[in-house]
Amino acid sequence: MLCCTAISITSFQRPMNITQPPQKTIVITGATGAIGGALAFEYAAPGVSLVLQGRDQQQLGALAVRCQQRGALTQCTSFDLRDTAKLRAWAAELCITTPPDLLIANAGMNINIGEEGAGERWEEMEALLDLNIKSTLALVSSIAGAMRQRGSGQIAIISSLAAYYGLPVTPSYSASKAAVKAYGEGLRGWLAADNVGVTVVMPGYVASPMCQAMPGPKPLLWTPERAARVI
């Protein structure tokens, strides 16, 4: 809810020129996930326009209401990011007037070898690689070009500590996060001259259904809210 404060101006004072602060536009993919939702809520404030993407429409709508209650404007979209043609069209739409100030490429999925260690199934591996790598590169490359042309912007790519060392229970996930880590680091050097920053975020275990589905211990488990504050 927005609050208005009345200002009394005497005849001896010059009228105050009160202008609306410019909207800061933040795009977050995977906003219905634990980290994505916590990030959206953390950034929600007056003067912020949140563009939220997620696959669960009901959860996305509830998140939008919570963010609006903190004063943010929200725009929601729900589609499968693995449809890269639709993804690139959406990214182009976002940049028609001006590209976002901040893009958080957060969407992703995880698979594992199973409780019995039977191994990952190719169908799941293919879906993971399409979402975690292909869609991330498609989105970031589409918006990075517009930011570069404008001469400003910030991109955050959510990787993982698993990018440093392949976890035996999640080999494909580890490989995908290593890929986007390398991509973000390379992109950072290319875009620096155009005043576009690139941050590669490397969270550890964060409490979520995705994390819970992984077999084995989860040391140093963080809440999504704590992770969002640090990010």
Which residue ranges define each predicted feature?
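Conserved glycine-rich cofactor-binding loop
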Residues: 32-33
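Conserved glycine-rich Rossmann-like NAD(P)H-binding loop of the short-chain dehydrogenase/reductase
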Residues: 46-63
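Rossmann-fold cofactor-recognition segment
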Residues: 69-85
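Conserved mid-core segment of classical short-chain dehydrogenase/reductases
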Residues: 110-126, 169
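Active-site helix of classical SDR
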Residues: 140, 176
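Residue(s) in the substrate-gating loop at a strand-loop-helix junction
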Residues: 160
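C-terminal helical subdomain
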Residues: 193, 200, 216-231
